[in-house]
């Protein structure tokens, strides 16, 4: 089994631990100084509040809040043969590398790791087998230039919340029209899941998938006309831009520490 340590058992760290536990191919140590956070991963990994224990794994995941990164790096002792996978939003690889002899890989994950459906973006000097094994166990990933990491942070890091918002909006409108709220949520959720699966499986452009659903004088084409005449696409773009800007701001805040 691959040995992995996760430093920080908050939302993202816990999701990653749960995903690795679900996969079953990893021996995971979870580190946190918060007893409640450790209790949340009890039974899924080896919980510890001893940083030196967490530092023993070949691959160590840094899953703390950006503002905590400098503190952890000041105490974390790793060797040149180890890999430090940082998932802290806005924290550049060069900053982390300046504080450790370990190989540093930067990843922007998301909470779907818990269910093996994570979308992740990774930046490295060369592919790292330990990191690849982790990412493949909990979802899919793409390799990107680190200059695009703020964009990835907005797209796949913050993106799930934007999708939740859309699911809620569609379910709420169906509920307002008389549908049982639970039924509306099931239908809206499965619709997004099915649509995403269709896009993932298709080689065709998304626009052609839309056209395939839009029969002439049918219901879908009427709804699409409303969307195309609205500012929905622009507003979604603005949401991504705002998240990306905040990611860049976090990098500056960490550099100032």
Positions of the model-derived regions?
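Internal alpha-helical scaffold of NAD(P)-dependent oxidoreductase catalytic cores
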Residues: 98-103, 119-152, 163-202, 246
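NAD(P)+-binding Rossmann beta1-loop-alpha1 motif at the extreme N-terminus of oxidoreductases
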Residues: 1-49, 55, 99, 117, ...
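Small-residue helix-packing motif on alpha-helices
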Residues: 38, 54, 96, 180-187, ...
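NAD(P)-dependent Rossmann-like dehydrogenase/reductase catalytic/cofactor-binding core
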Residues: 189-257
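Rossmann-fold NAD(P) dinucleotide-binding segment
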Residues: 49-102
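Residues at the starts of beta-strands that form the adenosine-phosphate
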Residues: 3, 26-27, 83, 103, ...
């Amino acid at each position: 089994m691959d040995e992995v340590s996760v430093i920080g058992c908050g939302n993202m760290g816990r999701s990653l631990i749960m995903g690795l536990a679900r996969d079953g191919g990893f021996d995971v140590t979870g580190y946190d100084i918060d007893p409640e956070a450790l209790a949340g991963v009890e039974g899924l990994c080896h919980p510890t509040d001893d940083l030196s224990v967490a530092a023993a794994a070949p691959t160590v995941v840094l899953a703390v809040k950006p503002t905590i990164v400098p503190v952890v790096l000041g105490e974390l002792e790793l060797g040149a043969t180890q890999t430090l996978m940082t998932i802290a939003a806005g924290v550049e690889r060069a900053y982390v590398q300046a504080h450790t002899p370990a190989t540093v890989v930067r990843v922007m994950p998301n909470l779907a790791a818990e269910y093996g459906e994570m979308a992740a973006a990774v930046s490295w000097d060369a592919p790292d087998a330990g990191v690849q094994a982790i990412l493949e166990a909990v979802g899919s990933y793409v390799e990107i230039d680190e200059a695009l990491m703020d964009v990835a942070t907005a797209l796949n890091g913050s993106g799930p919340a934007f999708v939740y918002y859309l699911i809620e909006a569609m379910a709420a409108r169906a509920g307002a029209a008389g549908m049982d709220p639970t039924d509306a949520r099931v239908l809206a959720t499965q619709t997004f899941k099915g649509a995403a699966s269709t896009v993932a499986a298709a080689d065709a452009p998304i626009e052609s998938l839309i056209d395939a659903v839009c029969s002439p004088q049918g219901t879908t084409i009427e709804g699409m006309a409303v969307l195309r005449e609205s500012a929905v696409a622009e507003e979604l773009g603005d949401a991504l831009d705002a998240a990306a800007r905040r990611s860049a701001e976090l990098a500056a805040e960490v550099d100032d520490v």
